[in-house]
């Protein structure tokens, strides 16, 4: 999520066993995407677009504690029949601000409760998302900042920890942007993929992010598609390597406005679908959303319907966002807890995130 959302998150912070995935090269015809769900935000609060993340084990916004993240996920799965959650977290938090260091027992333990909560909800995909914008404290990974080995160290540990659960997917990095050399970034992604597979996570999905905030509209023209197409598993294949794309629907594609102006089909998802089909690959939309407004209900539903109609190349989507966001946040999809303990979805979640998938 981009800068203004970081600001909203910072404000909140201040105030507050599935069968192995099938090959991405052999997607069966389907009436809708395989995975649909939401982000469960909180552990990423305090992370800026420059790759600084300020939360510690004592200050963290833990969606499992303050926001009943377990109850939210249980509701989305059991009541709404969604089946996927993306679980954003800051790199620094996981290693207690020690670049290249071991997972911090306390911090990683808190996050592990969220991952296990996702699994226990019955979800079929639980995405670990490192929410650092291809950076550590302002410096780009593999391009003047942290070395590839230091980034690989994080992913090797996470893959080792979760290698035996095929519901866990690995989202290499949230929204790389202004990366000078996309080929070098692809080398970084390749190093991570190799480390994850060699750690024993041989079948899980790995999500590959491109440049320009991993924009679905820019993915082909900015060279991300070409560069990331060269990323392979150790056996040379690309099974379960899925391109990770984002796209918002407001006037500047920032995901900071409550009004939507486009369904992103003609300028983003149709060209991407054509390219994916030609190249026998798949993508997943792990961030998108809008306000609880008539315009967003129209356009966001149309976008999801298009993804469903092209499920041979789109694996799924996770909307932004539920978890630690309260009802004042512009793009909130956090369900509202009722007096009887049940949950009521926001308007956009009910109509589009849930409805456009459930009714496909």
Task: Mark where each language-model region is.
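A generic structural motif
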Residues: 5, 317-322
